[in-house]
């Protein structure tokens, strides 16, 4: 889709944005650094501390730090927010299946974000056997302790900022058993044993196997990282809600109409399952 936007001071305004639900997108479990404050969403998108809100069909993205290159900022946020994906076409395609149509109609404005790889990897390792409020608390503590302060906020730490952090120091952030996995992930990233660019060039099957060489990264965490930061849209993360959905809604398997875009469809299925299926 073509990018349509205007600039207003430190704010980029994406125009003609239809069917975008910020609340469900930021609260559906794919990201952990966004909070709703004063009727706006505030958090980090990569290096940019932002406030985001909607006014009718216009999306306002205000950067809370000075922007040196507005074209770069606008392009980054357009992709980060998934505005470059044709959801009108995808939802029409998915709706060829009646169950998918019902799931889409329940929450049509959910989007998949395109997040930074390193942050996504570490936050989903932290998400193992965890709940969202606790994940956010640990991730925020990690940013405050090791990240760069930008205004009144803290960016997620880079690999180099974590190079000397020990397992014991991660434990102090209440990571528990995940501390050794975070340590291993940072080590493998810094050494080049796991390389983001190489990962993104692989097909889905090879990429999943490649990233699972990191300790503590099983199929679910791998699929979340591949979907939310590597544009592997065929990735289909499975948790208890998705497994219930597969059993109750798709006993004969997923429909052909979502093939190749299973990860996008997964977000509609996941949200519908959480609020409509029996436990």
Language model regions located:
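HhH-family (HhH-GPD) DNA N-glycosylase catalytic core used in base-excision repair
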Residues: 1-279
